[in-house]
Protein backbone atom coordinates (compact mmCIF):
# COMPACT_ATOMS: atom_id res chain seq x y z
CA UNK A 1 0.00 0.00 0.00
CA UNK A 2 1.16 3.53 -0.66
CA UNK A 3 2.29 5.44 2.39
CA UNK A 4 -0.01 8.22 3.48
CA UNK A 5 1.43 11.41 4.99
CA UNK A 6 0.80 11.92 8.67
CA UNK A 7 0.70 14.96 10.87
CA UNK A 8 -0.52 18.38 9.88
CA UNK A 9 -0.38 17.60 6.19
CA UNK A 10 -2.86 14.79 6.70
CA UNK A 11 -5.31 16.79 8.80
CA UNK A 12 -8.94 16.37 7.76
CA UNK A 13 -10.21 19.02 5.39
CA UNK A 14 -13.62 20.57 5.25
CA UNK A 15 -16.26 19.54 2.75
CA UNK A 16 -14.98 19.69 -0.83
CA UNK A 17 -17.07 21.88 -3.17
CA UNK A 18 -18.97 19.65 -5.59
CA UNK A 19 -17.38 21.29 -8.64
CA UNK A 20 -13.92 20.15 -7.51
CA UNK A 21 -14.85 16.46 -7.68
CA UNK A 22 -13.38 14.73 -10.71
CA UNK A 23 -16.62 13.00 -11.70
CA UNK A 24 -18.47 16.34 -11.75
CA UNK A 25 -15.79 17.95 -13.90
CA UNK A 26 -15.77 15.01 -16.35
CA UNK A 27 -19.57 14.99 -16.52
CA UNK A 28 -19.65 18.72 -17.31
CA UNK A 29 -16.89 18.24 -19.89
CA UNK A 30 -18.84 15.45 -21.62
CA UNK A 31 -21.98 17.60 -21.77
CA UNK A 32 -20.00 20.56 -23.11
CA UNK A 33 -18.36 18.32 -25.71
CA UNK A 34 -21.74 17.04 -26.90
CA UNK A 35 -23.11 20.57 -27.25
CA UNK A 36 -20.05 21.90 -29.06
CA UNK A 37 -19.89 18.90 -31.40
CA UNK A 38 -23.58 19.25 -32.23
CA UNK A 39 -23.70 23.01 -32.85
CA UNK A 40 -20.15 23.46 -34.21
CA UNK A 41 -19.28 20.11 -35.81
CA UNK A 42 -16.26 21.39 -37.74
CA UNK A 43 -14.72 22.78 -34.58
CA UNK A 44 -15.63 19.59 -32.73
CA UNK A 45 -13.76 17.37 -35.17
CA UNK A 46 -10.68 19.55 -34.76
CA UNK A 47 -10.60 18.83 -31.01
CA UNK A 48 -9.74 15.15 -31.50
CA UNK A 49 -6.08 15.76 -30.48
CA UNK A 50 -7.25 16.67 -26.95
CA UNK A 51 -8.73 13.22 -26.41
CA UNK A 52 -5.84 11.48 -28.15
CA UNK A 53 -3.28 13.38 -26.08
CA UNK A 54 -4.94 12.41 -22.80
CA UNK A 55 -5.07 8.74 -23.80
CA UNK A 56 -1.37 8.90 -24.70
CA UNK A 57 -0.57 10.49 -21.34
CA UNK A 58 -2.31 7.67 -19.48
CA UNK A 59 -0.77 4.98 -21.69
CA UNK A 60 2.64 6.50 -20.94
CA UNK A 61 2.29 5.57 -17.26
CA UNK A 62 0.38 2.26 -17.52
CA UNK A 63 3.47 0.08 -18.00
CA UNK A 64 5.31 1.43 -14.89
CA UNK A 65 2.13 1.12 -12.79
CA UNK A 66 1.60 -2.51 -13.81
CA UNK A 67 5.27 -3.39 -13.30
CA UNK A 68 5.49 -1.83 -9.84
CA UNK A 69 2.16 -3.25 -8.66
CA UNK A 70 2.76 -6.78 -9.93
CA UNK A 71 6.46 -7.07 -9.12
CA UNK A 72 6.14 -5.78 -5.54
CA UNK A 73 2.95 -7.77 -4.97
CA UNK A 74 4.47 -11.09 -6.06
CA UNK A 75 7.83 -10.35 -4.40
CA UNK A 76 5.97 -10.20 -1.09
CA UNK A 77 4.55 -13.69 -1.56
CA UNK A 78 6.36 -16.50 0.22
CA UNK A 79 4.38 -19.23 -1.54
CA UNK A 80 5.02 -19.26 -5.29
CA UNK A 81 2.22 -21.78 -5.78
CA UNK A 82 -0.09 -18.96 -4.77
CA UNK A 83 0.81 -16.98 -7.90
CA UNK A 84 -0.26 -19.87 -10.11
CA UNK A 85 -3.37 -20.42 -8.02
CA UNK A 86 -4.48 -16.79 -8.31
CA UNK A 87 -3.83 -16.77 -12.06
CA UNK A 88 -5.67 -20.08 -12.49
CA UNK A 89 -8.74 -18.94 -10.57
CA UNK A 90 -8.79 -15.67 -12.48
CA UNK A 91 -8.71 -17.49 -15.82
CA UNK A 92 -11.54 -19.81 -14.74
CA UNK A 93 -13.61 -16.77 -13.80
CA UNK A 94 -12.76 -14.98 -17.06
CA UNK A 95 -13.63 -17.99 -19.22
CA UNK A 96 -16.92 -18.59 -17.42
CA UNK A 97 -18.30 -15.07 -17.58
CA UNK A 98 -16.88 -14.21 -21.00
CA UNK A 99 -18.65 -17.25 -22.42
CA UNK A 100 -21.83 -16.32 -20.56
CA UNK A 101 -21.69 -12.82 -22.05
CA UNK A 102 -21.33 -14.28 -25.57
CA UNK A 103 -24.31 -16.58 -25.00
CA UNK A 104 -26.44 -13.74 -23.66
CA UNK A 105 -25.63 -11.68 -26.76
CA UNK A 106 -26.78 -14.57 -28.96
CA UNK A 107 -30.00 -15.09 -27.02
CA UNK A 108 -30.94 -11.40 -27.04
CA UNK A 109 -30.23 -11.09 -30.78
CA UNK A 110 -32.47 -14.08 -31.51
CA UNK A 111 -35.29 -12.74 -29.36
CA UNK A 112 -35.21 -9.03 -30.30
CA UNK A 113 -33.91 -9.47 -33.88
CA UNK A 114 -32.71 -5.85 -34.25
CA UNK A 115 -31.68 -6.36 -37.90
CA UNK A 116 -34.89 -7.97 -39.12
CA UNK A 117 -36.72 -6.11 -41.89
CA UNK A 118 -33.75 -4.12 -43.21
CA UNK A 119 -33.33 -6.41 -46.29
CA UNK A 120 -29.83 -5.21 -47.18
CA UNK A 121 -28.28 -6.81 -50.26
CA UNK A 122 -24.77 -8.01 -49.24
CA UNK A 123 -23.55 -7.27 -52.78
CA UNK A 124 -24.41 -3.59 -52.33
CA UNK A 125 -22.12 -3.19 -49.33
CA UNK A 126 -18.75 -1.56 -49.83
CA UNK A 127 -16.03 -3.93 -48.57
CA UNK A 128 -13.48 -1.11 -48.79
CA UNK A 129 -15.16 0.61 -45.84
CA UNK A 130 -14.00 -2.15 -43.49
CA UNK A 131 -10.92 -3.29 -45.41
CA UNK A 132 -8.52 -1.80 -42.87
CA UNK A 133 -10.26 -3.52 -39.95
CA UNK A 134 -10.41 -6.82 -41.84
CA UNK A 135 -6.68 -6.61 -42.63
CA UNK A 136 -5.86 -6.08 -38.96
CA UNK A 137 -8.20 -8.94 -38.04
CA UNK A 138 -6.38 -11.37 -40.34
CA UNK A 139 -3.14 -10.47 -38.58
CA UNK A 140 -4.71 -11.40 -35.23
CA UNK A 141 -4.25 -15.20 -35.18
CA UNK A 142 -4.42 -17.26 -31.98
CA UNK A 143 -0.84 -18.49 -32.40
CA UNK A 144 0.39 -14.98 -33.09
CA UNK A 145 -1.46 -13.63 -30.07
CA UNK A 146 0.04 -16.22 -27.71
CA UNK A 147 3.59 -15.80 -29.05
CA UNK A 148 3.25 -12.01 -28.83
CA UNK A 149 2.82 -12.25 -25.05
CA UNK A 150 6.57 -12.91 -24.83
CA UNK A 151 8.42 -9.64 -25.53
CA UNK A 152 11.42 -9.56 -27.85
CA UNK A 153 13.19 -7.29 -25.36
CA UNK A 154 12.28 -5.91 -21.95
CA UNK A 155 12.74 -2.37 -23.20
CA UNK A 156 10.52 -3.10 -26.20
CA UNK A 157 7.66 -4.26 -23.99
CA UNK A 158 7.72 -1.00 -22.02
CA UNK A 159 8.33 1.17 -25.07
CA UNK A 160 5.37 -0.32 -26.95
CA UNK A 161 3.15 -0.22 -23.86
CA UNK A 162 1.94 -3.77 -24.51
CA UNK A 163 -0.03 -4.68 -21.36
CA UNK A 164 0.36 -8.46 -21.63
CA UNK A 165 4.08 -8.26 -22.40
CA UNK A 166 4.69 -5.94 -19.46
CA UNK A 167 2.58 -8.21 -17.25
CA UNK A 168 4.52 -11.28 -18.41
CA UNK A 169 7.87 -9.71 -17.53
CA UNK A 170 6.54 -8.26 -14.25
CA UNK A 171 5.33 -11.68 -13.07
CA UNK A 172 8.68 -13.31 -13.88
CA UNK A 173 10.62 -10.48 -12.23
CA UNK A 174 8.42 -10.62 -9.13
CA UNK A 175 8.91 -14.39 -8.87
CA UNK A 176 12.68 -13.94 -9.23
CA UNK A 177 12.71 -11.34 -6.45
CA UNK A 178 10.77 -13.66 -4.16
CA UNK A 179 13.06 -16.62 -4.89
CA UNK A 180 16.32 -14.79 -4.10
CA UNK A 181 15.01 -13.94 -0.64
CA UNK A 182 16.91 -11.35 1.40
CA UNK A 183 19.26 -10.61 -1.50
CA UNK A 184 16.34 -9.12 -3.40
CA UNK A 185 15.06 -7.03 -0.49
CA UNK A 186 16.96 -3.84 -1.49
CA UNK A 187 15.43 -4.03 -4.97
CA UNK A 188 11.97 -4.68 -3.55
CA UNK A 189 12.33 -1.76 -1.12
CA UNK A 190 13.44 0.50 -3.97
CA UNK A 191 10.41 -0.50 -6.05
CA UNK A 192 8.13 0.25 -3.09
CA UNK A 193 9.71 3.72 -2.77
CA UNK A 194 9.40 4.29 -6.52
CA UNK A 195 5.70 3.47 -6.34
CA UNK A 196 4.84 6.72 -4.53
CA UNK A 197 6.10 9.21 -7.17
CA UNK A 198 4.79 7.08 -10.04
CA UNK A 199 1.30 6.96 -8.54
CA UNK A 200 1.51 10.67 -7.73
CA UNK A 201 2.23 11.27 -11.41
CA UNK A 202 -0.94 9.35 -12.26
CA UNK A 203 -2.85 11.62 -9.86
CA UNK A 204 -1.49 14.66 -11.71
CA UNK A 205 -2.39 13.21 -15.12
CA UNK A 206 -5.93 12.40 -13.98
CA UNK A 207 -6.57 16.09 -13.44
CA UNK A 208 -6.45 16.49 -17.22
CA UNK A 209 -9.29 13.96 -17.63
CA UNK A 210 -12.02 16.61 -18.17
CA UNK A 211 -10.02 18.14 -21.04
CA UNK A 212 -9.53 14.75 -22.66
CA UNK A 213 -13.18 13.80 -22.24
CA UNK A 214 -14.30 17.15 -23.68
CA UNK A 215 -12.14 16.78 -26.79
CA UNK A 216 -13.05 13.14 -27.40
CA UNK A 217 -16.80 13.73 -27.05
CA UNK A 218 -16.75 16.89 -29.20
CA UNK A 219 -14.98 14.93 -31.94
CA UNK A 220 -17.40 11.99 -31.77
CA UNK A 221 -20.54 14.12 -32.02
CA UNK A 222 -18.98 16.53 -34.53
CA UNK A 223 -17.87 13.76 -36.88
CA UNK A 224 -20.78 11.33 -36.66
CA UNK A 225 -23.60 13.57 -35.43
CA UNK A 226 -26.36 12.62 -33.03
CA UNK A 227 -28.65 11.95 -35.99
CA UNK A 228 -26.37 9.21 -37.34
CA UNK A 229 -27.55 6.84 -34.64
CA UNK A 230 -31.27 7.22 -35.37
CA UNK A 231 -31.50 4.62 -38.15
CA UNK A 232 -29.78 1.97 -36.05
CA UNK A 233 -31.27 3.00 -32.72
CA UNK A 234 -32.79 -0.44 -32.10
CA UNK A 235 -29.39 -2.14 -32.25
CA UNK A 236 -27.82 0.49 -30.00
CA UNK A 237 -30.72 0.37 -27.55
CA UNK A 238 -30.68 -3.43 -27.48
CA UNK A 239 -26.96 -3.48 -26.81
CA UNK A 240 -27.11 -0.88 -24.04
CA UNK A 241 -30.06 -2.62 -22.38
CA UNK A 242 -28.41 -6.04 -22.62
CA UNK A 243 -25.17 -4.72 -21.13
CA UNK A 244 -27.10 -2.99 -18.34
CA UNK A 245 -29.00 -6.18 -17.50
CA UNK A 246 -25.76 -8.18 -17.58
CA UNK A 247 -24.18 -5.79 -15.08
CA UNK A 248 -27.19 -5.50 -12.77
CA UNK A 249 -28.47 -9.09 -12.94
CA UNK A 250 -25.50 -11.37 -13.72
CA UNK A 251 -22.68 -9.38 -12.12
CA UNK A 252 -25.14 -8.20 -9.48
CA UNK A 253 -25.83 -11.81 -8.47
CA UNK A 254 -22.10 -12.55 -8.36
CA UNK A 255 -21.53 -9.47 -6.21
CA UNK A 256 -24.34 -10.33 -3.80
CA UNK A 257 -23.06 -13.90 -3.43
CA UNK A 258 -19.62 -12.53 -2.60
CA UNK A 259 -20.85 -10.06 -0.01
CA UNK A 260 -21.10 -6.69 -1.74
CA UNK A 261 -23.56 -4.68 -3.81
CA UNK A 262 -23.01 -4.06 -7.52
CA UNK A 263 -24.64 -0.63 -7.19
CA UNK A 264 -22.31 0.26 -4.33
CA UNK A 265 -19.34 -0.83 -6.44
CA UNK A 266 -20.51 1.29 -9.37
CA UNK A 267 -20.85 4.26 -7.04
CA UNK A 268 -17.35 3.60 -5.69
CA UNK A 269 -15.73 3.62 -9.15
CA UNK A 270 -17.91 6.37 -10.64
CA UNK A 271 -14.93 8.60 -11.46
CA UNK A 272 -13.31 5.84 -13.48
CA UNK A 273 -16.60 5.03 -15.24
CA UNK A 274 -17.11 8.66 -16.27
CA UNK A 275 -13.53 8.82 -17.49
CA UNK A 276 -14.20 5.76 -19.65
CA UNK A 277 -17.46 7.28 -20.87
CA UNK A 278 -15.66 10.39 -22.05
CA UNK A 279 -12.73 8.64 -23.73
CA UNK A 280 -14.35 5.36 -24.91
CA UNK A 281 -11.28 3.56 -23.56
CA UNK A 282 -11.28 1.38 -20.46
CA UNK A 283 -7.47 1.57 -20.59
CA UNK A 284 -7.65 5.23 -19.54
CA UNK A 285 -8.93 4.19 -16.12
CA UNK A 286 -6.61 1.21 -15.56
CA UNK A 287 -4.11 2.85 -13.14
CA UNK A 288 -6.81 4.48 -11.02
CA UNK A 289 -8.91 1.28 -10.98
CA UNK A 290 -5.96 -0.75 -9.72
CA UNK A 291 -5.45 1.74 -6.91
CA UNK A 292 -9.17 1.80 -6.06
CA UNK A 293 -9.35 -2.00 -5.82
CA UNK A 294 -6.34 -2.10 -3.52
CA UNK A 295 -7.85 0.59 -1.31
CA UNK A 296 -11.09 -1.44 -1.23
CA UNK A 297 -9.30 -4.31 0.49
CA UNK A 298 -7.95 -6.46 -2.36
CA UNK A 299 -4.32 -7.46 -1.86
CA UNK A 300 -1.86 -5.88 -4.29
CA UNK A 301 -0.71 -9.28 -5.57
CA UNK A 302 -4.27 -10.13 -6.63
CA UNK A 303 -4.97 -6.70 -8.12
CA UNK A 304 -1.72 -6.77 -10.09
CA UNK A 305 -2.53 -10.13 -11.67
CA UNK A 306 -6.29 -9.92 -12.20
CA UNK A 307 -6.88 -6.43 -13.63
CA UNK A 308 -4.15 -6.27 -16.32
CA UNK A 309 -4.97 -9.84 -17.41
CA UNK A 310 -8.66 -9.04 -17.40
CA UNK A 311 -8.08 -6.24 -19.89
CA UNK A 312 -7.43 -8.93 -22.52
CA UNK A 313 -9.31 -11.95 -21.19
CA UNK A 314 -12.35 -10.56 -19.35
CA UNK A 315 -14.15 -8.18 -21.71
CA UNK A 316 -17.82 -8.83 -21.00
CA UNK A 317 -19.08 -5.80 -22.90
CA UNK A 318 -17.04 -6.68 -25.99
CA UNK A 319 -18.34 -10.26 -25.89
CA UNK A 320 -21.99 -9.18 -25.74
CA UNK A 321 -21.35 -6.78 -28.61
CA UNK A 322 -19.65 -9.39 -30.81
CA UNK A 323 -22.44 -11.98 -30.92
CA UNK A 324 -25.18 -9.35 -30.95
CA UNK A 325 -23.56 -7.43 -33.84
CA UNK A 326 -22.82 -10.61 -35.81
CA UNK A 327 -26.45 -11.73 -35.67
CA UNK A 328 -27.62 -8.19 -36.48
CA UNK A 329 -25.57 -8.25 -39.70
CA UNK A 330 -26.96 -11.68 -40.60
CA UNK A 331 -30.54 -10.52 -39.95
CA UNK A 332 -30.07 -7.24 -41.85
CA UNK A 333 -28.74 -9.09 -44.91
CA UNK A 334 -31.43 -11.81 -44.71
CA UNK A 335 -28.90 -14.57 -44.04
CA UNK A 336 -30.45 -17.29 -41.85
CA UNK A 337 -28.08 -18.79 -39.30
CA UNK A 338 -28.72 -22.35 -38.20
CA UNK A 339 -28.03 -23.56 -34.68
CA UNK A 340 -24.73 -25.07 -35.86
CA UNK A 341 -23.76 -21.74 -37.45
CA UNK A 342 -24.43 -19.92 -34.19
CA UNK A 343 -22.49 -22.51 -32.19
CA UNK A 344 -19.55 -22.05 -34.57
CA UNK A 345 -19.85 -18.28 -34.14
CA UNK A 346 -19.82 -18.74 -30.36
CA UNK A 347 -16.74 -20.99 -30.40
CA UNK A 348 -14.79 -18.68 -32.71
CA UNK A 349 -15.75 -15.62 -30.65
CA UNK A 350 -14.57 -17.37 -27.46
CA UNK A 351 -11.09 -17.53 -28.97
CA UNK A 352 -10.88 -14.28 -30.90
CA UNK A 353 -12.23 -12.16 -28.04
CA UNK A 354 -9.32 -13.12 -25.80
CA UNK A 355 -6.95 -10.89 -27.71
CA UNK A 356 -9.00 -7.69 -27.56
CA UNK A 357 -7.28 -4.81 -25.82
CA UNK A 358 -8.99 -2.07 -23.80
CA UNK A 359 -8.62 0.59 -26.52
CA UNK A 360 -11.14 2.32 -28.72
CA UNK A 361 -11.98 0.26 -31.81
CA UNK A 362 -10.49 -3.03 -30.56
CA UNK A 363 -13.98 -4.56 -30.33
CA UNK A 364 -14.64 -3.74 -33.98
CA UNK A 365 -11.37 -5.37 -35.07
CA UNK A 366 -12.15 -8.44 -32.97
CA UNK A 367 -15.57 -8.68 -34.60
CA UNK A 368 -13.86 -8.59 -38.00
CA UNK A 369 -11.56 -11.41 -36.87
CA UNK A 370 -14.56 -13.49 -35.83
CA UNK A 371 -16.57 -12.93 -39.01
CA UNK A 372 -13.57 -13.70 -41.20
CA UNK A 373 -13.62 -17.25 -39.80
CA UNK A 374 -17.42 -17.70 -39.90
CA UNK A 375 -18.30 -18.06 -43.61
CA UNK A 376 -22.05 -17.55 -43.17
CA UNK A 377 -21.81 -13.86 -42.20
CA UNK A 378 -20.13 -11.43 -44.66
CA UNK A 379 -17.33 -9.29 -43.24
CA UNK A 380 -18.47 -6.49 -45.56
CA UNK A 381 -21.67 -6.38 -43.50
CA UNK A 382 -19.70 -4.59 -40.82
CA UNK A 383 -20.09 -1.46 -42.95
CA UNK A 384 -23.66 -1.35 -41.61
CA UNK A 385 -22.46 -0.63 -38.08
CA UNK A 386 -19.23 1.22 -38.85
CA UNK A 387 -20.88 4.62 -38.37
CA UNK A 388 -22.35 3.77 -34.97
CA UNK A 389 -19.53 1.69 -33.55
CA UNK A 390 -18.12 4.71 -31.72
CA UNK A 391 -21.42 5.12 -29.86
CA UNK A 392 -21.35 1.46 -28.85
CA UNK A 393 -17.71 1.64 -27.82
CA UNK A 394 -18.55 3.57 -24.64
CA UNK A 395 -20.93 0.86 -23.45
CA UNK A 396 -18.43 -1.89 -24.23
CA UNK A 397 -15.72 -0.12 -22.24
CA UNK A 398 -18.00 0.64 -19.27
CA UNK A 399 -19.19 -2.97 -19.04
CA UNK A 400 -15.62 -4.24 -19.34
CA UNK A 401 -14.49 -1.99 -16.50
CA UNK A 402 -17.25 -3.07 -14.11
CA UNK A 403 -16.64 -6.71 -15.01
CA UNK A 404 -12.96 -6.47 -14.13
CA UNK A 405 -13.68 -4.67 -10.86
CA UNK A 406 -16.08 -7.46 -9.85
CA UNK A 407 -13.58 -10.14 -10.93
CA UNK A 408 -10.85 -8.61 -8.76
CA UNK A 409 -12.97 -8.66 -5.61
CA UNK A 410 -14.24 -12.19 -6.30
CA UNK A 411 -10.78 -13.68 -6.91
CA UNK A 412 -9.41 -11.87 -3.85
CA UNK A 413 -12.22 -13.38 -1.77
CA UNK A 414 -11.58 -16.86 -3.17
CA UNK A 415 -7.94 -16.51 -2.14
CA UNK A 416 -8.75 -15.08 1.32
CA UNK A 417 -6.84 -11.98 0.24
CA UNK A 418 -9.72 -9.58 0.81
CA UNK A 419 -9.97 -7.20 3.75
CA UNK A 420 -13.74 -7.27 4.26
CA UNK A 421 -13.68 -4.27 6.61
CA UNK A 422 -12.02 -2.11 3.96
CA UNK A 423 -14.41 -3.43 1.34
CA UNK A 424 -17.42 -2.60 3.51
CA UNK A 425 -16.07 0.89 4.19
CA UNK A 426 -15.50 1.49 0.47
CA UNK A 427 -18.93 0.19 -0.51
CA UNK A 428 -20.63 2.26 2.21
CA UNK A 429 -19.07 5.46 0.91
CA UNK A 430 -16.60 5.96 3.74
CA UNK A 431 -13.77 8.16 2.41
CA UNK A 432 -10.85 6.03 1.28
CA UNK A 433 -7.43 7.70 1.28
CA UNK A 434 -5.90 7.34 -2.18
CA UNK A 435 -3.23 9.09 -4.19
CA UNK A 436 -5.05 8.58 -7.47
CA UNK A 437 -8.48 10.08 -6.94
CA UNK A 438 -8.36 13.83 -7.47
CA UNK A 439 -11.53 14.61 -5.52
CA UNK A 440 -9.61 13.86 -2.30
CA UNK A 441 -7.00 16.34 -3.46
CA UNK A 442 -9.02 19.20 -4.94
CA UNK A 443 -7.53 21.65 -7.37
CA UNK A 444 -6.60 25.03 -6.00
From Swiss-Prot:
**Primary localization:** membrane
Task: Spell out the GO cellular component terms annotated for this protein, sorted alphabetically and separated by semicolons.
Answer: plasma membrane
Q: Transmembrane segments in this chain: where? A: 21-41, 57-77, 92-112, 161-181, 201-221, 234-254, 320-340, 345-365, 368-388
Which Gene3D superfamilies does the annotation name? Sodium:dicarboxylate symporter
Q: Where in the cell is it found?
A: Cell inner membrane
Q: Please indicate if the UniProt record lists Isomerase as a keyword.
A: no
Q: How does this protein lie in the membrane?
A: Multi-pass membrane protein
PROSITE patterns per UniProt: NA_DICARBOXYL_SYMP_1, NA_DICARBOXYL_SYMP_2
Q: Which GO terms describe its biological process?
A: L-aspartate transmembrane transport
Gene Ontology molecular function terms on file: fumarate transmembrane transporter activity; malate:proton symporter activity; succinate transmembrane transporter activity
InterPro entries annotated for this entry?
C4_dicarb_transport, Na-dicarboxylate_symporter, Na-dicarboxylate_symporter_CS, Na:dicarbo_symporter_sf
Q: Give the record's keywords alphabetically.
A: Cell inner membrane, Cell membrane, Membrane, Symport, Transmembrane, Transmembrane helix, Transport
Q: Which family does it belong to?
A: Belongs to the dicarboxylate/amino acid:cation symporter (DAACS) (TC 2.A.23) family.
Q: Which PANTHER family match?
A: AEROBIC C4-DICARBOXYLATE TRANSPORT PROTEIN, PROTON/GLUTAMATE-ASPARTATE SYMPORTER
**Purpose of the protein:** Responsible for the transport of dicarboxylates such as succinate, fumarate, and malate from the periplasm across the membrane.
- Name this polypeptide is given: C4-dicarboxylate transport protein
What organism does this protein naturally occur in?
Brucella anthropi (strain ATCC 49188 / DSM 6882 / CCUG 24695 / JCM 21032 / LMG 3331 / NBRC 15819 / NCTC 12168 / Alc 37) (Ochrobactrum anthropi)
Classification from the root reads: Bacteria, Pseudomonadati, Pseudomonadota, Alphaproteobacteria, Hyphomicrobiales
Amino acid sequence: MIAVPTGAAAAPRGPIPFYKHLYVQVLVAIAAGILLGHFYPELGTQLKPLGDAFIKLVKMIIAPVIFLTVATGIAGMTDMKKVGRVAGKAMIYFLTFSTLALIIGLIVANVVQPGAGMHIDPASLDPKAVANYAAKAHEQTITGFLSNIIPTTIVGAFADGDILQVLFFSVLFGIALALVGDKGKPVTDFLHVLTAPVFKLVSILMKAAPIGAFGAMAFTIGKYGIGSIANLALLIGTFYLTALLFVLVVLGAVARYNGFSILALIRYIKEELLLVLGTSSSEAALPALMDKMEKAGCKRSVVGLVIPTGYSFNLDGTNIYMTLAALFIAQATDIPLSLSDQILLLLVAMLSSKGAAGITGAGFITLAATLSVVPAVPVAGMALILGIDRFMSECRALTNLVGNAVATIVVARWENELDTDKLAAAMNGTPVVTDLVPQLEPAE
